[in-house]
Amino acid sequence: QSPIYSTPPWGVPDQDEFLNAILIVNVAQTPRELLRRGQRLEAAAERRRTRKWGPRTLDVDIIQVIDANGVELVSEDPELILPHPWARHRAFVLVPWLAADPEARLLGVPVREIVEKLDIADVEAVVEA
């Protein structure tokens, strides 16, 4: 698990800051089952999808799935694109991920190298793991 990071809101600036963290989990579930589990967690947190990129109580995204053989799964299924299509552009995803797993790779590229190309000035750890 990463520290919790605070970042300015993404997409719609007129809202409170975002709090972001990464959890790395080992499960026997399929990616689709993980998606459903994340959606149940969001529902339990009373998430309401009223405005795209708007405020939410919880937002669970599946960034990457690695199978039992250590192979990164790639999917173009519109319901669950893997790896997450915007992850490589979002410091608020990659900085916590790097903190949780300094050896992380995304599509074969070290996450550290991707982070080095991003503006991370607004990504600030507020709660340590």
Labelled PLM ranges:
Residues 10-19, 32-129:
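Flexible, gly/pro- and Lys/Arg-enriched active-site loops
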